[in-house]
Amino acid sequence: MKLAIGRLLSPLFLKNPQKPLIITKRFYSTPGERRIKDILTEKLSPSSLRVIDVSGGCGSMYQVAIKSKAFQGKNTLAQHRLVNSILKEEIRNMHGLNLSTEVEDDISAGGSTTSS
């Protein structure tokens, strides 16, 4: 059956019909992503929040991009420290956290977006 599907799709979608078609985009959240989203939403009421488990689903590395009014008046380091303190318990079980923060109303400077 896999060969039949491969042959059927090969003219349109596959460069090499001998290799299987692999879909890599996830359309679901991991439990860790949901937990981090819930915590940050409750504490910071962000206007924009994206949490991605970049460890392949094992929950050891996350990428977080957050935009919130709670960051007003804080420099980038203070913004990151705030997020780190909120996620203190979760961070203990992580290998790493890639964090990007932005002030919600800072239109002129384009926000305070950085990665660490």
Swiss-Prot record:
Where does this protein chiefly localize?
A: mitochondrion
Superkingdom in the source lineage: Eukaryota
**Keywords noted in UniProt:** Mitochondrion
The record, for SUPFAM superfamilies, names: BolA-like
Subcellular locations according to the entry? Mitochondrion
For this record, the Gene Ontology CC terms, alphabetical, are:
mitochondrial matrix; mitochondrion
What Gene3D superfamilies does the database record attribute to this sequence?
A: BolA-like
Record family assignment: Belongs to the BolA/IbaG family.
Name this polypeptide is given: Uncharacterized bolA-like protein C4B3.11c
* Organism the protein comes from: Schizosaccharomyces pombe (strain 972 / ATCC 24843) (Fission yeast)
